[in-house]
Amino acid sequence: MAKQAKAGAARRPQRGRRRERKNVPRGQAHVQATFNNTIVTITDPAGNVVCWSSAGASGFKGSRKSTPYAAQVTAEQAARKAMDNGMRVVEVYVKGPGAGRESAVRALQATGLSVIAITDVTPIPHNGCRPPKRRRV
C-alpha cells in the first residue's frame, strides 16, 4: 500500500510545455541598446513576443556585452529564430544610446529579413529626472 502511494507521488504532470511554432510572416524587431547590453526582441504586429535574444544570452560576459559585435551576434540569433517561425518582413524599432544600434540593424538585414522601416523610439525626457553624475576616470 505504501509503495503505491509513493509511485503515484513521483509521477508529476509535465511542467514545461513544448513551445509551439508560430507562423508569423511579418512582425516587429525591437532593439534595446543600453550602455551595458543589447536585447533584440521580435514580436508579431500585435506585440506578442515570438522570440528574443540578448548579448548575455549569446554567451558574452561583462564589458564584452556592450560591443557592436555582441549586438550583431545577438541580432543574427534572434533573426534566425524568427525565420524558423516563418517571419520574412520586419519593422525595426531602436531604443537606447548603446554601441550596438547600427550593427544590430545591419545584422537583421544581412540574415535575410526584409527591413521595411527603421524607427528610433529612444525616450527623451522633457527635463524629467536628473541624469547620473559625470564619471571621473
Swiss-Prot record:
Function of the molecule: Located on the platform of the 30S subunit, it bridges several disparate RNA helices of the 16S rRNA. Forms part of the Shine-Dalgarno cleft in the 70S ribosome.
Protein name stated in the entry: Small ribosomal subunit protein uS11
Gene3D superfamilies in alphabetical order: Ribosomal protein S11
Bias-annotated ranges (Basic residues): 12-21
GO terms for MF: rRNA binding; structural constituent of ribosome
Keyword Ribosomal protein carried by entry: yes
Keyword terms of this UniProt record: Ribonucleoprotein, Ribosomal protein, RNA-binding, rRNA-binding
Gene Ontology CC: ribonucleoprotein complex; ribosome
NCBIfam families (alphabetical): PRK05309.1, uS11_bact
GO biological process, one term: translation
Gene name of this polypeptide: rpsK
Subunit structure: Part of the 30S ribosomal subunit. Interacts with proteins S7 and S18. Binds to IF-3.
Keyword Cytoplasm in record: no
Organism the protein comes from: Herpetosiphon aurantiacus (strain ATCC 23779 / DSM 785 / 114-95)
InterPro entries (alphabetical): Ribosomal_uS11 (IPR001971), Ribosomal_uS11_bac-type (IPR019981), Ribosomal_uS11_CS (IPR018102), Ribosomal_uS11_sf (IPR036967)
Record's compositionally biased regions (Low complexity): 1-11
Protein family membership: Belongs to the universal ribosomal protein uS11 family.
UniProt-annotated stretches for the region Disordered: 1-32
